[in-house]
């Protein structure tokens, strides 16, 4: 079997995580959610840990006996799967993806929490991590959040943020999708191949009504600028509930 020419072991051979016993990672396809600050550990990082993410976008935290690393500002499939490969190199065996999605289902409104029960694949990053021709990728980590109102969804993983046309959305809806992002199928595919358990949750940041007069309602701008909104409240609640499941 062929092996890749470039590997995390080659690029990061002298690097180790500065905290022992870390097996869980939050990979955030968004800016650092403020709720993580209350779990932060004072850990000094002296070397760059990830090829595509600066150390200013990572932190270490702890809840009870569980230590974890948080990596933020991870955008798009290629960067996402690179982070997964590097986390595997560091001994991480559990990844929780966090991010935003856009909804085109009127029943799933801005501020709603979604659990990626599966994710529709587009041609691009994902197929490099699959051994079979399939339309969907699936989570391998079981996390239930019964205290929250969580929508089980199929996420359309698109490759081009500024190229979401009406015909594409109709096709995605016909394939069982109700929300869209650029991350989930790549994350699931990379984790499955590398034997890392994973589940992705997100908060709806914007909505598209194909039949409405104003087609797109946008709260994403506020969300990425950390402005107070229903989105930030939902994100804080979501992360708090996930962290309480870690022990």
From Swiss-Prot:
An example Gene Ontology molecular-function term: catalytic activity
Superkingdom to which the source organism belongs: Viruses
Alphabetical list of Pfam families matching this protein: PNP_UDP_1
InterPro entries associated with the record: Nucleoside_phosphorylase_d, Nucleoside_phosphorylase_sf
Disulfide bonds: none
GO terms, biological process: nucleoside metabolic process
Gene3D superfamilies attached to this UniProt entry: Nucleoside phosphorylase domain
Name of the protein in question: Uncharacterized protein R802
